[in-house]
């Protein structure tokens, strides 16, 4: 947990984070509905994921038409077949814009629920800092991505680090990166 930053209010009961991730499917309205339902359910925070696909993947030819349950327009999917289509990553239709994230941050403030976003790349870190997030969160998969951890640590922003599947030695190394800054 973050110490002495006023970012997370410590209390005796657990701090509940509702993981929304990219389950909004690129729809701002659905993201807001998920925030509202999370608040009604008693969550203290909602957490999204932000990525800049151009930073994360090599530019390769598209291998297939993006279809299946992740389809945004629902016209290229036959749900009765119960067959998943091919999902060409990155499916940019699932991403929200920086403007959308700012709107979600304001919506969370209005509902009095904490707004958390896990960035997956340096461009996303910069975008989140620009919109004024209170803190950053590193996904467990990136807890041993020491270059990325150092980049985030250099921003001197309060940070929560998930450490699932990390060894004790790896956690200490990640911790030492943040202590340098």
Where are the language model's segments positioned?
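Catalytic domains of carbohydrate-active enzymes, especially glycoside hydrolases
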Residues: 33-52, 131-132
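Conserved, mostly hydrophobic/aromatic
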Residues: 19, 38, 128, 162
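Active-site-adjacent beta->alpha loops and helix N-cap segments on the catalytic face
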Residues: 27-28, 95-101, 126, 138-156, ...
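N-terminal amphipathic alpha-helix/helix-capping segment at the start of soluble metabolic enzymes
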Residues: 1-18
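Active-site beta-loop-alpha junctions enriched in small/polar residues
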Residues: 21-23, 51-53, 120-122, 139-141, ...
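Hydrophobic faces of well-ordered beta-strands that scaffold small-molecule active sites
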Residues: 16-20, 46-48, 115-118, 136-138, ...
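Glycine-rich, proline-tolerant flexible connector loops at the mouths of alpha/beta enzymes
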Residues: 44-95, 124
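A structural motif corresponding to the C-terminal end of an alpha-helix
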Residues: 41, 97-115
């Amino acid at each position: 947990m973050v110490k002495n930053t006023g970012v997370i209010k410590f209390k005796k009961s657990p701090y509940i984070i509702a993981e929304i991730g990219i389950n909004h499917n690129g729809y701002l309205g659905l993201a807001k509905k998920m925030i509202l339902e999370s608040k009604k359910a008693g969550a203290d925070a909602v957490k999204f994921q932000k990525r800049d696909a151009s930073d994360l993947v090599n530019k390769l030819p598209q291998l297939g038409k993006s279809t299946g349950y992740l389809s945004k327009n629902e016209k290229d999917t036959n749900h009765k077949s119960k067959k998943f289509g091919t999902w060409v990553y990155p499916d940019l239709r699932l991403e929200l814009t920086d403007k959308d994230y700012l709107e979600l941050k304001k919506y969370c403030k209005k509902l009095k629920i904490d707004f958390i976003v896990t960035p997956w790349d340096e461009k996303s870190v910069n975008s989140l800092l620009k919109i004024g997030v209170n803190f950053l969160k590193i996904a467990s998969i990136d807890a041993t991505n020491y270059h990325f951890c150092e980049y985030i640590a250099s921003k001197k922003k309060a940070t929560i680090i998930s450490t699932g599947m990390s060894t004790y030695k790896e956690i200490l190394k990640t911790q030492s990166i943040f202590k340098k800054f």
